[in-house]
Amino acid sequence: MPRVHAIEDYRNFGIMAHIDAGKTTTTERILFYTGKSHKIGEVHEGAATMDWMAQEQERGITITSAATTAFWNGKRLNIIDTPGHVDFTIEVERSLRVLDGAVCVLDSNQGVEPQTETVWRQGDKYRVPRIVFANKMDKTGADFFKCLQDIVDRLGAKPVAIQLPIGSENNFKGLIDLVRMKAVVWNDESLGAKFEDTDIPEDLLEQAKEYREKMIEAAVELDDDAMAAYLDGKEPDEATLKRLIRKAVLNGAFYPVLCGSAFKNKGVQPLLDAVVDYLPSPVDVPAIKGIDEDGNEVVRKADDSEPLALLAFKIMDDPFVGTITFCRIYSGVLQSGTGVVNSTREKKERIGRMLLMHANNREDIKEAYAGDIVALAGLKEARTGDTLCDPAKPVILEKMEFPEPVIEIAIEPKSKADQEKLGVALAKLAAEDPSFRVSTDIESGQTILKGMGELHLDIKVDILKRTYKVDANIGAPQVAFRERITKKAEVDYTHKKQTGGTGQFAAVSFIVEPNEPGAGYEFISKVVGGSVPKEYIPGVEKGIESVLGSGVVAGFPVVDVKVTLVDGKYHDVDSSALAFEIASRAAFREALQKGKSVLLEPIMKVECVTPEDYTGSVIGDLNSRRGQIQGQDMRGNANVINAMVPLMNMFGYVNNLRSMSQGRATFTMQFDHYAEAPANVSAEVQKKFA
């Protein structure tokens, strides 16, 4: 079956925002107006089409990014819904990785909020072209112009209004399209499906002219001919203006800002037009790079004639179809029934069912092309971030990087049957979400779940209980401490066990020193003259690595350490890889003692937004949690407090903050860095764990 839509007519985009900015409602309206959804789902009634997991429906927040295909003005839109809660930033990163463009939704009353900054920075990291939609213009306190200023002050970006609101709060009627210089007004009776172009109201004409001039000046800067014509008094026509704005979006020169109220069905159709006019198609963004089997860099262009390459960006367990792997096809054509290779894991796979997903229903397809986002059922080996490709032309596309989890809880199944269900469920959850890790505590035998925050783990436990029907006891959350040495240590160690028969003998000399923060563990062998034969070096490494997971301070993983093997001795008969493993283990433990190992604790970047009346209490409380206040500024009439606080002192903070501020203050936190724990904290932790 030949391609229906040219690749130039694709728009793969996501909608990113702070929690509660109206992202899901905006997506819902897009699906409604593009004819994919027959009933509008309201988030506050828990029925939105995109929010399809039971946990999301209950909490009213979007957790998993579902991919949806819709059509507008002959263009094919693939929409990735991204979560807005800080515990799910991994999902946001993952969807930004496979998008070509994004719509950043702001709450016009709040402007740029903490999580908006986080997702914006992630967008910068992946260089995602963006347009901005100032939503909730009907809300009390909505201020479009404050949003523009916020984008400058808080994101350091250049906003350019391409629309202006007509009225605000209860009087929000529609908008002025500055590109066409027309007013667009919505008919309330038709659920916003009907709107009409009219002349710009007299009282707003001057303002419209002023902002149109600003828009044109920003646009013509990108084109010498247009600039010369403009300086001669010739304004660019509509087509030229759109071309220049599109160029600005693709280069990140400025960000067009639109306005509307998704909930009141105003401004959604012009937003869709802007997606088509200004966001890139797969051929407008740089071609994806990868590594071939010889380690050379190769490029895969967005073209059906290129060798097949696709990236798995999301894995979900579907009750009807089984495991579904969402993939972005970067190049080539994918047909069901063909064999592909998972180059990341060097495993072969056969493509079975191929599905086009609409938020909650699916359409079987036989063929998909470059630029498509498809769901594949029944892949056995694929994990998030894996590359699937043509076996004749293997390539590994850029890897996704996932942050280390900072919080953990123990989970104990109540019965043997639960134990079996838990094993299956955890394997599936870990495959779906790389920021969620599962391990077993060697000493206690407990299963440990690790994640990015309390909410992240709460949701996982909820899924275990609801979806997989696992009955289990959950322990209190624990902090993921680390250990590192603080000074260089030199050790010589001999392991000797020679009492008749084949004995054991190995001697090693190490220099162990702190590595750069974040550099991790590094092993270097500087042995000369065969004092430790080559075949025993893996034994040496194995011995060191067996200690890395459990340091000498309180049994936590050791990080940022460099171990150099400088010398050693061996015996022709009694030496073995095992003997060197035992010697290295003991030598490394001794070095950790000598090198003055210390305990590291995760420090979180906390931002509290509070009415001025409670500022004193909030700061006092953060100080009592060993927080270091980094600074304060005003946002509207609220005070924003930035602080660095140890994670161990942030448990249950949400309830404290609520009661302290009568529910009016909010906070967000994310992992920032590891720092040495004070002596009293270290002693307390040692007493508890060592």
Swiss-Prot record:
Give me the Gene Ontology terms describing cellular component: cytoplasm
The record's keywords, sorted A to Z, are: Cytoplasm, Elongation factor, GTP-binding, Nucleotide-binding, Protein biosynthesis
Name of the molecule in the record: Elongation factor G
The scientific name of the source species is Rhodopseudomonas palustris (strain HaA2)
Q: SUPFAM superfamilies, per this entry?
A: EF-G C-terminal domain-like, P-loop containing nucleoside triphosphate hydrolases, Ribosomal protein S5 domain 2-like, Translation proteins
Give every tr-type G domain span.
8-283
> Where does it reside?
Cytoplasm
This protein's superkingdom?
Answer: Bacteria
Instruction: Output the Gene Ontology terms for molecular function.
Output: GTP binding; GTPase activity; guanosine tetraphosphate binding; translation elongation factor activity
Annotated family: Belongs to the TRAFAC class translation factor GTPase superfamily. Classic translation factor GTPase family. EF-G/EF-2 subfamily.
Binding positions (GTP): 17-24, 81-85, 135-138
Functionally, this protein is described as follows: Catalyzes the GTP-dependent ribosomal translocation step during translation elongation. During this step, the ribosome changes from the pre-translocational (PRE) to the post-translocational (POST) state as the newly formed A-site-bound peptidyl-tRNA and P-site-bound deacylated tRNA move to the P and E sites, respectively. Catalyzes the coordinated movement of the two tRNA molecules, the mRNA and conformational changes in the ribosome.
* Gene Ontology terms describing biological process: ribosome disassembly
Specify whether GTP-binding is a keyword of the entry.
yes
Instruction: Give yes or no: UniProt keyword Nucleus.
Output: no
